[in-house]
A protein has these predicted regions:
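Short, glycine/charged-enriched secondary-structure capping and boundary segments
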Residues: 13-16, 25-27, 55-60, 81, ...
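Short catalytic/ligand-binding loop motif for oxyanion handling, primarily in non-cytosolic enzymes
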Residues: 7-9, 49-51, 99, 217-218
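Interdomain motor-coupling "hinge/lid" segment immediately C-terminal to the ATP-binding subdomain
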Residues: 37, 45-47, 51-151, 155
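Conserved Walker B catalytic segment
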Residues: 4-41
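A generic local structural motif
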Residues: 26-30, 51-52, 194-195
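Accessory nucleic acid-recognition modules appended to NTPase machines
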Residues: 105-106, 110-223
Length: 223
């Protein structure tokens, strides 16, 4: 049920004729606790709660389940067209489930681009109370998207903004922005396995998008 918290209270069906007895969705959820074959899952927008908040808000009372976009195996199993085209579709549009409901390239690309424009960027700014404008975050994501597979770090990215865009953004600020995207499961990062101790500090690493379709959408499917 989407936006369940907006549902108004209703008359208690177990007490007909008693107009003063009302129940809400909370009462319904509490009633499910006594059933042995029912699991209750609560989800929310990035702007409202991230995984880092779960440990605090639901300490010892819940378990986090990290749901990723579809893997290729899952995508292939659900792909409605000829299976020989599944890989090409997957590496182009990724594994966001709703992509599979779109028919044309235009519909799929618009959906993925709108996720950034209307949801992800706004959520990250709102959730983290960032001073950065959406354009700066857009540019950072574009740089990371075009450099997937290349070693980089916040210092190099900061220098890129300064030399190419003429924007002075401290490497600490770039690092903080990247961490926001990682917390929102938009990006991930991979360290070199052969680095030890203090060498980890500012050593180049690789950033990647959790969904290849989202990465391609950042570049308007040019690469």
């Amino acid at each position: 049920l989407d936006e369940i918290q907006m549902v108004e209270e209703v008359d208690n069906p177990y007490l007909p004729g008693n107009s003063g007895s009302k129940i809400t969705f909370v009462d319904v959820l509490l009633g499910l606790k006594g059933l042995s074959n029912v699991d209750v899952y609560v989800t929310g927008s990035n702007s409202k709660m991230l995984s880092s908040d779960v440990a605090t808000a639901f300490r010892d009372r819940g378990e986090e389940i990290h749901i990723t976009p579809l893997t290729y195996d899952e995508f292939h199993a659900a792909y409605p067209k000829e299976k020989r085209f599944a890989w090409r579709e997957f590496v182009t549009y990724g594994g966001m489930p709703l992509v599979m409901q779109k028919s044309t390239h235009g519909e799929k690309s618009k959906y993925l681009q709108d996720l950034f424009r209307l949801t992800y960027i706004k959520d990250v700014i709102e959730r983290n109370r960032l001073r950065a404008d959406a354009e700066t975050l857009d540019e950072l994501l574009n740089v990371v998207a075009s450099a997937v597979g290349s070693l980089t770090n916040p210092t190099r990215l900061s220098n890129t903004f300064r030399s190419v865009k003429g924007l002075k953004i401290k490497n600490e600020t770039v690092s903080a922005y990247l961490d926001c995207f990682i917390d929102a499961y938009i990006l991930g990062k991979s360290y070199r396995y052969d680095i030890k101790g203090r060498s980890y500090i500012d050593t180049p690493l690789k950033y990647y998008f959790t969904d290849i379709g989202l990465r391609n959408a950042r570049l308007n499917f040019r690469q």
